[in-house]
């Protein structure tokens, strides 16, 4: 474990919760930051608070509702249908979201004396989101370091993992059931296994089933 401090960009979902658990194994002191941007499922905020409290992690909540004004999308507006047309970005894409989140997480890290920033973005299952790519994160890391003259390190533990491998990581962290039962991934705001119909639920369920099949075959 590094005797250093880390900030985790945290939504209360499967990926960011796995990252939070990973960070708790890696760093001496860990804090989490959640962004309120009028997301479609308001339960996300409450779930994030609950998980942070259960894990004994200091939790910051930042108001980012300006994103909803600048970038109307299916994650923030009930009147926009969740869909993904071939050759187009999904309607859940929020332009600049991860750029803004990582920038503000870096500002918070500066203020609390943290060097490490952890985000759960993933290029393997990135659904076409350009701000989930490894090259974007590396570019952002260089930018915030130049902007604040700090040697921040942005970590992406899930970058090259598919959903089955993300479940495997949760299991390696002795938290498979915790992540399965306590997190909120569903676009319709249903905790744990979710609605089973939205793209996020299907991706999550398929990954879980694939991992459990792999685990059984290894036994």
From Swiss-Prot:
Named cofactor requirement(s): Zn(2+)
Pfam family, one: QueC
Source species, domain of life: Bacteria
SUPFAM superfamilies given in the database record: Adenine nucleotide alpha hydrolases-like
GO MF terms, alphabetically ordered: ATP binding; ligase activity, forming carbon-nitrogen bonds; zinc ion binding
Residues engaged in binding ATP: 10-20
Catalytic activity, as annotated: 7-carboxy-7-deazaguanine + NH4(+) + ATP = 7-cyano-7-deazaguanine + ADP + phosphate + H2O + H(+)
Keywords associated with the record: ATP-binding, Ligase, Metal-binding, Nucleotide-binding, Queuosine biosynthesis, Zinc
Pathway: Purine metabolism; 7-cyano-7-deazaguanine biosynthesis
Family annotation (Gene3D superfamilies): HUPs
InterPro entries: QueC, Rossmann-like_a/b/a_fold
GO biological process, one term: queuosine biosynthetic process
Purpose: Catalyzes the ATP-dependent conversion of 7-carboxy-7-deazaguanine (CDG) to 7-cyano-7-deazaguanine (preQ(0)).
Family: Belongs to the QueC family.
Assembly mode: Homodimer.
Name of the featured protein: 7-cyano-7-deazaguanine synthase
Source organism per UniProt: Bacillus licheniformis (strain ATCC 14580 / DSM 13 / JCM 2505 / CCUG 7422 / NBRC 12200 / NCIMB 9375 / NCTC 10341 / NRRL NRS-1264 / Gibson 46)
Primary gene name: queC
């Amino acid at each position: 474990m590094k005797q250093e401090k880390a900030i985790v960009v945290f939504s209360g979902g499967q990926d960011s919760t796995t990252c939070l658990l990973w960070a708790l194994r890696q760093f001496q002191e860990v804090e989490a930051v959640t962004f309120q941007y009028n997301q479609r499922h308001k339960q996300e905020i409450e779930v994030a608070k609950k998980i942070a409290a259960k894990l004994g992690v200091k939790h910051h909540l930042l108001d980012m509702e300006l994103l909803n004004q600048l970038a109307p999308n299916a994650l923030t507006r009930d009147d926009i249908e969740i869909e993904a047309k071939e050759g187009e970005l999904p309607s859940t894409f929020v332009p600049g979201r991860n750029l803004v989140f990582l920038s503000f997480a870096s500002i918070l890290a500066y203020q609390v004396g943290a060097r490490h920033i952890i985000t759960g973005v993933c290029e393997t299952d990135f659904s076409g989101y350009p701000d989930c790519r490894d090259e974007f994160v590396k570019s952002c890391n260089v930018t915030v370091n130049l902007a604040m003259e700090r040697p921040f390190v942005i970590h992406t533990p899930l970058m090259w993992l598919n959903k089955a491998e993300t479940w495997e990581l949760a299991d390696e962290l002795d938290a498979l059931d915790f992540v399965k039962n306590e997190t909120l991934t569903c676009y319709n705001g249903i905790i744990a296994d979710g609605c089973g119909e939205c793209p996020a639920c299907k991706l999550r369920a398929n990954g879980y089933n694939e991992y459990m099949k792999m685990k059984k075959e290894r036994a």
